[in-house]
Amino acid sequence: MTRQIIPSSEFASLFLQARPLIDVRAPIEFTKGAFPSAINLPLMKDSEREKVGTCYKQQGQESAIKLGHALVSGTVKEQRIAAWRKAIEANPSSYLYCFRGGLRSQLSQQWIKEAGFDIPYIQGGYKALRTFLIQILESSAALNSMLILSGRTGSGKTDFLQLRDEAVDLEQLANHRGSSFGKNLDPQPSQINFENQLAIAVLQHQTKHHRHLLLEDESFLIGRSALPKAFYNSMQHADIVLLEEDDEQRLQRLLFDYVDNKLASFVSRLGDEAGLKAFGDYLNASLNGIKKRLGGKFLQELLDSVARALAHQISQNDTSLHLDWISQLLTRYYDPMYDYQLSQKQQRVLFKGDHASMHAWLDELRK
């Protein structure tokens, strides 16, 4: 017989196995935050939940339960059960949850059982799962094992991290490259979803028993995704390794990241004409995003250089002229800012080297 309730002692394995989850909360609750392996098949829609909530406040629990049954009955009830059945048939090992593991979980489980399926619900619901993940991010195992990968803009930190098993890629989780030019076409996750995904990544890292958790040197905000405060504070005190790269390689990498790859993404999504226009708008918006730091005169120089590069690109099908403004941005903005920031934390630097020597040093550290 299938167990009726999944206890908190199994939360770690639930996330590590990416167990299929059926979230029976209302869509508005799901949108604010959920888990990567969850789908939203609500017991009550937003309007139904709101009516039941109002009834509960005014008339109490018994009246609210009666109203809930009245709202979700007949054809509506059959449709909800049919959606659950379809999901369970596709993933028979699914678990379900509501917000606290209370009436919504129990009622959904009962209706599903009456339809011929027997699946458990999660003890404590979403709130308990969320608390578990927050505790992972605040655990001493996570906070005391960090090693920070730093390096100048364009040094290839993200490419490097993706080759390291002991790394967690914060920018990938945030769906943002971290700089003014880091915005992607697809939206960033909600703050709660970002934190949940980060916690699961840290949990996965802990099962590998690495000595260090390798992270890229990030600001508190990655786009609009904020790192958890305790997690970020630990990053600010962790040891650092510096990834070095020659200037020409940095320029070519940024030409690909800021221009060639980004242009291809816009064109693929929007078509040639609309994609090119959106790409130009993206470059101008990215520069305007740091206009206070650049100053009006330098900003205008960069915008003019971008305009020339775009015109040359259109007429000659050649993006190389973009190297002019990228080079200016590096030498007059990014590099001085990085050098100043590094001067404040030199005492934390353990090692510096190019990609090959950094890999070798980290491999030795793991022994």
UniProtKB/Swiss-Prot annotation:
Active site positions, chain numbering: C98
EC code(s) of this entry: 2.9.1.3
Keyword vocabulary terms for this entry: Selenium, Transferase
Record domain Rhodanese: where: 15-138
Biological process per Gene Ontology, one example term: tRNA wobble uridine modification
Signal peptide residues on this chain, from the entry's feature table: none
Enzyme's top EC category: transferase
Example GO molecular function: tRNA 2-selenouridine synthase activity
Entries under CDD domains matching the protein: RHOD_YbbB
Homology family: Belongs to the SelU family.
Subunit structure: Monomer.
Protein purpose: Involved in the post-transcriptional modification of the uridine at the wobble position (U34) of tRNA(Lys), tRNA(Glu) and tRNA(Gln). Catalyzes the conversion of 2-thiouridine (S2U-RNA) to 2-selenouridine (Se2U-RNA). Acts in a two-step process involving geranylation of 2-thiouridine (S2U) to S-geranyl-2-thiouridine (geS2U) and subsequent selenation of the latter derivative to 2-selenouridine (Se2U) in the tRNA chain.
Protein name: tRNA 2-selenouridine synthase
